[in-house]
């Protein structure tokens, strides 16, 4: 009998079966999202329709931390560059990842880890966070950092709205060279007014 049903589900009723599977998978995803919103106390963001990029967050925190520190931040074309500096373990990387995860969750229709979040739709999100060297290819950490930044600049020079996250820029070289390279990159990125940038060092 199972073979009989299986035969018809794969043949005569194949399109109906696929449609039911699609509906069920969507319901399962929506239910899981609803459970996550309630479990983690997430709030739904407000999307603003405008041509310029915007992220306005109140009480933003990292969703994976049990005792997170909440941040307030606002970024727009007039203030499109957030430069983070401070001692190690001060929370720079955590803030960058909190912003990135909140913006990503908002774009997939999820609640976000914040009291309130207003933002525009972004055309893309780019991160330069986990850069690695490649000994087999003879590529140093610094080389791959430069390549990632180069690829980032090439992508965002298209007039679209991007959120760009860069953690500890040029840490693969000495302090003086890192400072010179960072200043050059920052000055170039600040000219791209249609995108928002968060960079730590």
Each predicted region: which residue ranges?
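Short intracellular "coupling" helices and adjacent cytoplasmic loop segments at the cytosolic face
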Residues: 10, 32-38
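ATPase nucleotide-binding head domains, primarily ABC-like/P-loop NTPase cores
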Residues: 36-201
């Amino acid at each position: 009998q199972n073979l009989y049903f299986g035969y018809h589900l794969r043949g005569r009723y194949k399109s109906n079966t696929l449609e039911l599977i699609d509906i069920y998978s969507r319901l399962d995803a929506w239910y899981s999202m609803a459970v996550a919103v309630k479990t983690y106390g997430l709030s739904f963001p407000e999307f603003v329709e405008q041509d310029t990029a915007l992220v306005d967050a109140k009480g933003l925190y990292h969703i994976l931390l049990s005792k997170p520190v909440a941040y307030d931040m606002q970024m727009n074309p007039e203030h499109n560059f957030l430069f983070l500096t401070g001692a190690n373990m001060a929370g720079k990387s955590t803030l960058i990842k909190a912003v990135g995860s909140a913006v990503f969750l908002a774009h997939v229709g999820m609640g976000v880890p914040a009291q309130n979040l207003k933002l525009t739709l972004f055309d893309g999100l780019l991160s330069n966070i986990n850069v690695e060297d490649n000994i087999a290819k003879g590529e140093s950490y610094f080389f791959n950092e430069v390549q990632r930044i180069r690829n980032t600049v090439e992508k965002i020079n298209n007039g679209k709205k991007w959120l760009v996250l860069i953690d500890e820029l040029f840490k693969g070289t000495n302090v003086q060279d890192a400072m010179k390279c960072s200043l050059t990159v920052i000055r170039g990125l600040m000219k791209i007014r249609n995108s928002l940038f968060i960079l730590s060092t």
